[in-house]
Swiss-Prot record:
It comes from Vibrio cholerae serotype O1 (strain ATCC 39315 / El Tor Inaba N16961). GO terms for cellular component: plasma membrane. GO terms for biological process: sodium ion export across plasma membrane. It catalyses: oxaloacetate + 2 Na(+)(in) + H(+) = pyruvate + 2 Na(+)(out) + CO2. This is Probable oxaloacetate decarboxylase gamma chain 2. It holds the Pfam family OAD_gamma.
Amino acid sequence: MQSTSLFLEGINLLTLGMGFVFIFLIFLVYATRAMSQLIVRFAPPEVPAKTTNKKASANKAKANPNQNQGELLAVLTAAVHHHKTQQKLS
């Protein structure tokens, strides 16, 4: 085979491959849109979430602000330790 013929075959294969990928991606977009419309049409309506009384939870938090100090200190210590070990590994 001559180099010109081989080059033209490569261009042909490139065009064919890119064409199939483009067609597949277009098909994928339309299939995704169709599935989305089916789900919206046949899915049950969302039930609104129950709301809690925010004033009651705020009052509980204000009643004892030092209650979780030990847990907070443990979490912060673990986070600092993890960060320092990650810095040593890098």
